[in-house]
Design a protein with these regions (language model features):
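Internal/C-terminal transmembrane anchor helices
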Residues: 1-7
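Active-site nucleophile-His-acid catalytic modules used for acyl/amide transfer and hydrolysis
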Residues: 129-166
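Flexible, active-site-adjacent loop/turn segments at secondary-structure boundaries
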Residues: 14, 39-41, 47
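Intramembrane catalytic core of multi-pass membrane enzymes that act on lipidic substrates
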Residues: 33, 37-39
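Alpha-helical transmembrane signal-anchor/signal-peptide segments
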Residues: 8-29
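Glycine-rich catalytic cores of cysteine/serine-nucleophile enzymes that process amide/ester linkages
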Residues: 33, 44-144
Length: 166
């Protein structure tokens, strides 16, 4: 069993489920960032959605708030949660990052496989309406909470966003 676990090699060359299909890519020009493949799905259910991919341009210096998002999978078992982060810009736009299991077509998520590192991971960059929308509208058992983050120190918001993008 251990030998099988160690033989599993991560790859970007697989048939992925549509919402994990594209990897975001950031291009930097000083303070300016252009982020491609930002997911902006319109979710009706977890299997019925309008697929949209977009790009977003922004200045790192315009990040004014950071939001922490916690999704408790089952409120009766609160210790199990998924954490996301959302960056708010001075113009009101929000860009969220969720580190997720990158599922292949036909693959079903299981927490035990996750603990044994049997999935590839993907930084999903998305509109906040996408990543919170799917949780609020489509995942009936889960509870999602949004908390304003406190980041101490000058320039911390910008540095945190840049560290996630690199």
């Amino acid at each position: 069993m251990l030998a099988m676990l160690r033989l599993a090699k991560p790859s970007n060359e697989r048939d992925w489920v549509p919402d994990n299909e594209r990897m975001a890519h950031a291009e930097f020009d000083g303070d300016e960032v252009r982020l491609r493949n930002v997911r902006d799905f319109g979710w009706r259910t977890t299997r019925d959605y309008d697929e949209r991919w977009t790009e977003m341009s922004f200045r790192l210096s315009e990040v004014c708030k950071i939001w922490l998002v916690l999704e408790y999978f089952d409120p009766k078992h609160r210790p199990i949660a998924h954490t996301l982060i959302s960056f708010e810009f001075e113009d009101g736009r929000r860009l969220a990052c969720s580190i997720e299991v990158r599922r292949e077509l036909g693959e079903v998520y299981h927490p035990l496989k996750g603990m044994l590192r049997q999935y590839e991971l993907l930084y999903v960059w998305a509109t906040e309406s996408d990543v919170i929308g799917v949780r609020a509208r489509c995942r009936r058992k889960s509870k999602t909470h949004l908390f304003e983050g406190v980041v101490l120190g000058e320039d911390s918001h910008r540095r945190l966003l840049k560290s996630f993008l690199l």
